[in-house]
Amino acid sequence: MSTSKYPSEIKINPNKGGKAAIERLVEAYGFTTRQALADHLEVSKSTLANRYLRDTFPADWIIQCALETGTSLKWLTTGQGLKQSSLTVATEELPKFRLTAGKMIEDGSYVFDSSFLPANLSSPIVIQDGLVTYICDQKFSEVLDGHWLINIDGTYSIRKITKLPKGMIKITTTENSFECAFSDIEVVACIRSTIVSN
């Protein structure tokens, strides 16, 4: 049975792991040599070499590096986990709406890692419909075949739109489909990404 008081407790031996940690410091700063690291830390080459050869753990340098570069303290210390701290990853907060009985209900916001979001979003929102989450864009140049957030007589829903000749469209749901004039509906947003929860 574990006697650890903390779920993420890490045991650090001050006399072990120094070589690997110093190599991670070089990588985190973007240097190519340990000499460049020594110059940046304003320590002599012999001081750094001594810690490296004795495998002495450089806790003070690791803290400095984490503060200066935003590199994950866990990665610098152990080499495990993500190199970049979650605190420095670019994020974007999007307004969230929930579809309930055909109504769009404001429901806070979601924060996403920016790299997760589709490119070129101009006016993004998140729509939650049951177990499905949609990342949508309210700004679009034209309506093409695909899935859209639409408003029909005050009822909002996610539907597949297929353009037909003479200003007509086909609207498809999982249960049925029908045709109507494009002018009969309001297209609110384009569905750019779909996330399904189990």
UniProtKB/Swiss-Prot annotation:
InterPro entries: Lambda_DNA-bd_dom_sf, Phage_CI_C, Phage_CI_N. It comes from Escherichia coli. Pfam families: Phage_CI_C, Phage_CI_repr. This is Protein ORFi in retron Ec67. It comes from the Bacteria. GO terms for molecular function: DNA binding. GO terms for biological process: negative regulation of DNA-templated transcription; protein complex oligomerization. The lineage of its organism: Bacteria, Pseudomonadati, Pseudomonadota, Gammaproteobacteria, Enterobacterales. Keywords: Transposable element.
